[in-house]
């Protein structure tokens, strides 16, 4: 499978990846017709100064070759297709369990942190989990390339189980945070692997639809997770975490077994046997000790560089959420020192990646225009999104005397919109074979959704305003996210799919962490200030601090009382300072979207390699003898 070289861009030539594959049957193969000549189609899908050479494409890891063998084998006969459907059902079951877990445990955060008198620590938790889990994705991606996709699923399951056990048994806020980090790695790792496998096994025209389909369980789970939350909170929030230490292994094991079986069957193919024999010969020529193999694996996943990245961003951003607890706030030397050290570490990371790292976490070959634009769009999308959503559940908790169930329903409004319109966006990709303009429309809708929440000096408090804003934000967000995901995966060859699919959420989650870091000091400074201003003078400063630390105390006063109405006004005033920057920053991804490429979404696995169509029985086989497994 040899990569095609980049053509120069002129008035009469466009790059190969923007060519439209006409579905003409010729021994089962698809033929690329003449490329479109419009300016839109002339956009460079990848860096023209850095092509994917034959040597680059041949240096392929074992895990990539294994999943390619699976992809080829499932289209050869009905049995392979049935097994593929079974695997699809299995990962959909994983998505169901993950949807229930995230829909419920997100609501438990308020109660868990309140039990430790650390409600405002939610932002610190969000920063820590966002950065660490996102930094782990490139490691998981490289691990899946070096070993296999099933092996990585097993590793993710291990993180899941450990995290749930630690959180369920936590006696301090520190233990709760550590367990939450493990859960976040497991949850984000599962989502990442599901997305990666969908990218491995589907063509571009179905990519967005199938990826969005993995999120559809949220459409159903939202209606009964409220009952689960209500029942758990009435007894003990810890069991809400602990039960998933049993559920997740039960639902993930079938998916792992089926994928392992598919790999085993695919490895019986003669071409794969030749590759394995060649790899065995290479091993015999260059024998390495276990320590040498381990060191090579550490270098290949760029473990040192990713640790620098994660530690640097964590140390830089955590002071924003810790200043309210530090003596003298920003005047505390520790806060200043953390920011300085974090900045220095990030500079060191940049230098290490550019000049020292033998296997950079972000190789230059994937830094094409399409990928960079997708990163910019999602980076600011998440940054603005975290500004709006970080304390939005707490805000709605204060506004109305909803039951736990109804409160959970409302908090999942945006989730439902994201899932429903995500499938719609994927269907539009299948019908029109393009994604750019739908993404632009989505970003405009998202801005309108933010705007509905803003009133002069206050945030909206009406139920209709809140509901419509969440629906529009979810709708617009789904159009954008699905577009970024598809364009990112389309812009690189299959051998780089794992790294590109992990780097996009890495940088966008850093954007979310920055948004959380900005939201935390705004919330921690504004809420106590406005609580003191709008609460009756009969409430002393200690009570004000207690209301701020434990928002459930405010709920003890019915809506309409002087104390409750004063608290609502204080929270509404504070949310205004989060919503204004959120809507302002949302114009940046909108501008970037106009620079996005607009690949034709056809039968190919990606848009930069020519011979990428799924092979069916009777098709001419693609030789794999030139592939070398590292």
UniProtKB/Swiss-Prot annotation:
Cellular component aspect of the GO annotation: membrane; plasma membrane
Cytoplasmic side: 1-79, 142-154, 198-208, 263-302, 357-370, 428-439, 487-502, 596-630
Coiled coil: none
Gene Ontology annotations of biological process type: heme import across plasma membrane; transmembrane transport
Keyword Membrane found: yes
Cross-referenced Pfam families: MFS_1 (PF07690)
Null allele phenotype: Impairs heme import into cell; simultaneous disruption of shu1 exacerbates the effect.
Segments crossing the lipid bilayer: 80-100, 121-141, 155-175, 177-197, 209-229, 242-262, 303-323, 336-356, 371-391, 407-427, 440-460, 466-486, 503-523, 575-595
Subcellular location(s) per record: Cell membrane
Inducers of expression: Induced in iron-deplete conditions (at protein level). Repressed in iron-replete conditions by transcriptional repressor fep1.
Keywords from the named record: Cell membrane, Ion transport, Iron, Iron transport, Membrane, Phosphoprotein, Transmembrane, Transmembrane helix, Transport
Reported impact of residue 534 to A: Decreases heme binding and cellular heme import but does not affect localization to the cell membrane
Molecular function GO terms recorded: heme binding; heme transmembrane transporter activity; transmembrane transporter activity
Major location (coarse): membrane
Iron as UniProt keyword: yes
Region described as Disordered: spans on this chain: 1-51, 610-630
InterPro entries on file: MFS, MFS_trans_sf
Membrane topology (UniProt): Multi-pass membrane protein
Biased composition (Basic and acidic residues): 1-26, 611-630
Function (record text): Low affinity heme transporter involved in the assimilation of exogenous heme during conditions of low cellular iron.
Family named by the database record: Belongs to the major facilitator superfamily.
PANTHER family in UniProt: LOW AFFINITY HEME TRANSPORTER STR3, MAJOR FACILITATOR SUPERFAMILY
Protein name: Low affinity heme transporter str3
């Amino acid at each position: 499978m040899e990569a095609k070289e980049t053509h120069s861009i002129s008035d009469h030539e466009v790059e190969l990846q923007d060519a439209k594959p006409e579905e003409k049957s010729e021994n089962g193969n698809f033929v690329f017709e003449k490329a479109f000549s419009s300016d839109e189609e002339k956009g460079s899908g990848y860096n023209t100064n850095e092509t994917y050479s034959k040597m680059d494409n041949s240096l392929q890891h074992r895990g990539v070759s294994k999943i390619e063998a699976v992809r080829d084998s499932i289209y050869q006969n009905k049995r392979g297709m049935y097994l593929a459907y079974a695997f699809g059902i299995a990962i959909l079951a994983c998505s169901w369990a993950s949807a229930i877990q995230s829909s419920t445990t997100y609501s438990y955060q308020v109660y868990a942190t309140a039990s430790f008198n650390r409600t405002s620590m939610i932002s610190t938790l969000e920063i820590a989990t966002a950065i660490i889990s996102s930094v782990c994705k490139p490691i998981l991606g490289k691990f899946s390339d070096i070993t296999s996709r099933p092996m990585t699923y097993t590793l993710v399951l291990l993180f899941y189980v450990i995290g749930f056990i630690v959180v369920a048994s936590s006696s301090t806020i520190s233990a709760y945070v550590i367990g939450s980090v493990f859960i976040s790695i497991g949850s984000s790792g599962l989502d990442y692997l599901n997305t990666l496998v969908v990218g491995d096994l589907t063509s571009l025209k179905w990519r967005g639809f199938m990826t969005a389909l993995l999120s559809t369980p949220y459409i159903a789970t939202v209606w009964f997770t409220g009952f689960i939350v209500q029942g758990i909170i009435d007894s003990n929030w810890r069991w809400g975490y602990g039960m998933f230490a049993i559920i997740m292994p039960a639902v993930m094991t079938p998916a792992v077994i089926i994928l392992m079986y598919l790999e085993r069957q695919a490895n019986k193919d003669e071409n794969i046997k030749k590759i394995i024999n060649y790899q065995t010969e290479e091993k015999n020529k260059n024998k390495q000790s276990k320590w040498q193999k381990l060191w090579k694996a550490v270098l290949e996943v760029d473990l040192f560089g990713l640790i620098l990245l994660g530690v640097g961003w964590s140390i830089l951003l955590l002071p924003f959420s810790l200043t309210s607890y530090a003596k003298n706030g920003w005047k505390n030397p520790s806060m200043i020192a953390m920011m300085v050290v974090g900045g220095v570490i990030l500079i060191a990371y940049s230098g290490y990646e550019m000049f020292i790292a033998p296997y950079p976490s972000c190789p230059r070959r994937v830094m094409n225009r399409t990928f960079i634009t997708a990163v910019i769009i999602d980076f600011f999308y998440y940054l603005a999104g975290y500004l709006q959503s970080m304390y939005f559940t707490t805000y709605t908790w204060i506004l109305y005397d909803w039951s736990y169930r109804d409160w959970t329903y409302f908090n999942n409004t945006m989730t439902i919109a994201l899932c429903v319109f995500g499938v719609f966006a994927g269907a539009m990709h299948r019908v029109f074979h393009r994604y750019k303009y739908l993404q632009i429309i989505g970003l405009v809708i998202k801005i309108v959704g933010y705007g509905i929440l803003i009133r002069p000096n206050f945030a909206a408090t009406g139920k209709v305003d809140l509901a419509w804003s969440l629906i529009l934000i979810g709708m617009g967000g789904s159009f954008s996210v699905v577009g970024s995901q598809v364009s990112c995966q389309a812009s690189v060859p299959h051998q780089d799919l794992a790294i590109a699919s992990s780097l996009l959420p890495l940088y966008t989650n850093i954007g979310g962490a920055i948004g959380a870091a900005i939201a935390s000091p705004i919330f921690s400074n504004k809420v106590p200030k406005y609580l003191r201003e709008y609460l009756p003078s009969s409430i002393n400063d200690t009570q004000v601090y207690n209301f701020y630390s434990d928002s459930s105390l405010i709920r003890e006063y019915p809506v309409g009382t002087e104390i409750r109405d004063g608290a609502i006004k204080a929270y509404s005033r504070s949310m205004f300072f989060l919503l204004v920057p959120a809507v302002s920053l949302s114009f940046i991804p909108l501008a970037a979207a106009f620079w996005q490429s607009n690949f034709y979404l056809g039968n190919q696995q990606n848009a930069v390699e020519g011979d990428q169509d799924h092979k069916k029985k009777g098709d001419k086989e693609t030789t794999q003898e030139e592939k070398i497994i590292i």
